[in-house]
């Protein structure tokens, strides 16, 4: 169609406003109706990448970095609350808000950075699941990495059952992880006084790299995009009171879900500190941690729970990572592809480097990749946090829901902490690279240094007040567009007839519209068999003759109601022929039936409707 529908402008259109909020019920039932989005977000805070940084932090520095986890969790609650408020109040997710408020080139760069972060997160999920399969079933890591490519189908099946079923599915994984680590804490018998001392802030140059990794693993940039879209699955009353209630319930949901994630992360770090640091063991990979748990704790049950929790973490993060990728691509680019294909693409990007590194460095390379993936996430974080903070503090975007002054100050303190830690890490890393590069340092000066400076300038730009830069357009229209009072008239209407679609309904709608508008009606059917594909109009096979007789019979029946009906056969590919026939006969409207493909059928056969709709500049009425 030539115009964009309202559905194409919303986040996750398949589930947008699909969950009803009951009225005149108790507080608990209303809270449960809003519960869910934060739990989908929370699994990203306990994915395998967190395990790598938490394990190394606990094994190398004991309980010393617990305060970093606490700070990261508080920052996460604050930022995720901002993201939820943005989605509830404006009806726009963070990616759409960036597209609305920044020039296209800046939006494209922000999109690329976000895609890199999602790929880094997916890399952690691939490696985590593969390691879990290796620990549980003794599969080689490379085989495990390849197997993770097939979890795309799991996502596809779960998504088709609706957002509430998906939330329940994820909650099961969260519960499994929580139970496993509660048992691990019981087995490890930590020093609780030492745990309490870990909440006192202190940081050394050696622990900075791990601290930034923990920050990147705990506060994940793509989760901000995800949360701002997921809250729109609820049918929130579009009044100030309704939005305020939704913001309160989502704050409660976020606090509970992210504190559950904090418990899991804290349990991993405490487990590593009480088992490995206490025994003077330096853990360099997850497999090593798994192997040491049984002899050190005196039970094989500890190792089994560890592997089960790791697989659960990887698989639950897979689902939410795909949703985030879909939101980012649609929000920044207005480009929509099937989620399952999006999953294949993202997973392929993650699998390739994993296979290469494991092939070259062996199983030990997987742990290095996990740590690196979390640092990449942390470095991308400011490019999501600062726009979010600016949008939610802007009264022209949020109206009466804009952040209060003290909340804005807290937000900027969190943003400055993130930027300062990242800047320190980047400067130290580049300095070390140059110092160890020798004669090749020149290439670092002309590639890496300019890239880092460009990123710094981009960050300054997105942080600038809107009065210093031109906004592309407001997040919502400032005035209602003029609507023509002249009724739409259709002179020529086409109906696409297919044995596999609801033919009776298509004909009923086409007949009704043709009668109402006194329009000429064309009946189209495309011969898809071998004869039609190879010989086109020259085909005279039994299928073509039967199709011709079928169309003539329908046309004769419709003519009895006084309509001018013309049956037309097409030959070859359905989409190409329907577009050609519609243009040849100068249609004003095309009526089609939906196939209703589900699951794998829709992936492999595709949708004729979507392809025809994008090729034609006329309205297309889809009948199911």
Locate each region found by the language model.
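Glycine-rich, Arg-bearing micro-motifs that act as flexible, cationic patches
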Residues: 592-615
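Hydrophobic alpha-helical segments and their helix-loop junctions in multi-pass secondary transporters
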Residues: 152, 173-200, 208-229, 388-396, ...
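Structural beta-alpha unit
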Residues: 475-484, 559-590
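Small/aliphatic-rich secondary-structure junction motif
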Residues: 483-537, 541
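C-terminal membrane-solvent junction of multi-pass transporters and transport-like membrane proteins
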Residues: 169, 340-345, 369-426, 430
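Juxtamembrane transmembrane-helix boundary signature
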Residues: 41, 68-101, 110-116, 316
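Extracellular/periplasmic helix-exit of transmembrane alpha-helices
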Residues: 77-89, 231-241, 259-288
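Loop-to-transmembrane helix boundary motifs in multi-pass membrane proteins
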Residues: 104-107, 142-145, 256, 303, ...
């Amino acid at each position: 169609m030539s115009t964009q529908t309202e559905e194409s402008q919303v986040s996750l259109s398949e589930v947008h406003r699909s969950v009803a909020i009951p009225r005149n019920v108790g507080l608990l039932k209303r809270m449960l109706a809003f519960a869910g989005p934060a739990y989908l977000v929370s699994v990203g805070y306990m994915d395998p990448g967190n395990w790598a940084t938490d394990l190394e932090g606990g094994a190398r520095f004991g309980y010393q970095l617990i305060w970093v986890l606490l700070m990261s969790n508080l920052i996460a609650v604050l930022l995720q609350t901002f993201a939820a408020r943005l989605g509830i109040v404006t009806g726009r997710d963070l990616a759409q808000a960036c597209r609305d408020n920044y020039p296209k080139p800046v939006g494209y760069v922000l999109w690329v950075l976000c895609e890199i972060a999602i790929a880094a997160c997916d890399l952690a999920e691939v490696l985590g699941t593969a390691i879990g399969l290796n620990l549980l079933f003794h599969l080689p890591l490379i085989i495990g990495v390849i197997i993770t490519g097939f979890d795309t189908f799991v996502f596809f099946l779960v998504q088709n059952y609706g957002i509430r079923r998906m939330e329940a599915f994820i909650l099961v994984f969260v519960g499994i992880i929580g139970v496993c680590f509660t048992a691990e804490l019981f087995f490890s018998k930590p020093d609780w006084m030492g745990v309490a001392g870990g909440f006192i802030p202190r940081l050394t140059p050696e622990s900075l790299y791990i601290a930034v990794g923990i920050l990147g693993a705990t506060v994940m940039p793509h989760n901000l995009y995800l949360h701002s879209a997921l809250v729109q699955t609820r049918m929130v009353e579009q009044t100030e009171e309704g939005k305020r209630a939704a913001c309160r319930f989502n704050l409660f949901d976020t606090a509970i879900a992210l504190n559950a994630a904090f418990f899991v992360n804290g349990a991993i770090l405490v487990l590593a500190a009480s088992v490995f640091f206490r025994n003077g063991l330096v853990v360099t990979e997850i497999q090593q941690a798994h192997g040491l748990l049984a002899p050190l704790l005196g039970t094989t049950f500890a190792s089994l729970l560890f592997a089960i929790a790791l697989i659960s973490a990887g698989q639950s993060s897979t689902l939410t990572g795909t949703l985030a990728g879909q939101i980012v691509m649609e929000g920044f680019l207005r480009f929509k592809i099937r989620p399952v294909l999006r999953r294949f693409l993202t997973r392929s990007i993650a699998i390739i480097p994993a296979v290469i590194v494991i092939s070259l460095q062996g199983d030990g390379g997987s742990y290095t990749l996990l740590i690196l993936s979390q640092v990449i996430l942390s470095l991308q974080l400011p490019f999501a946090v600062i726009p979010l903070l600016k949008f939610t503090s802007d009264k022209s975007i949020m109206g009466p829901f804009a952040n209060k002054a003290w909340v804005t100050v807290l937000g900027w303190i969190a943003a400055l902490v993130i930027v300062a830690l990242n800047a320190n890490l980047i400067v130290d890393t580049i300095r070390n690279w140059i110092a160890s590069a020798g004669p090749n340092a020149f290439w670092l000066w002309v590639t890496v240094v300019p890239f880092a400076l460009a990123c710094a300038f981009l960050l300054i730009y997105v942080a600038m007040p809107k009065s210093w830069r031109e906004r592309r357009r407001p997040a919502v229209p400032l005035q209602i567009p003029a609507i023509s009072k002249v009724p739409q008239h259709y002179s020529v209407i086409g109906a696409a007839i297919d044995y596999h679609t609801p033919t009776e309904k298509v004909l009923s709608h086409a007949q009704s519209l043709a009668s109402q508008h006194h329009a000429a009606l064309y009946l189209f059917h495309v011969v898809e068999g071998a004869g039609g594909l190879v010989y086109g109009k020259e085909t005279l096979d039994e299928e073509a003759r039967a199709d011709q007789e079928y169309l003539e019979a329908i046309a004769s029946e419709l003519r009895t109601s006084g309509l001018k009906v013309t049956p037309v056969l097409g030959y070859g590919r359905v989409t190409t022929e329907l577009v050609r026939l519609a243009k040849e006969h100068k249609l004003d409207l095309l009526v089609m039936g939906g196939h209703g493909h589900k699951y794998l059928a829709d992936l492999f056969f595709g949708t004729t409707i979507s392809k025809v709709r994008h090729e034609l500049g006329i309205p297309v009425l889809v009948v199911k």
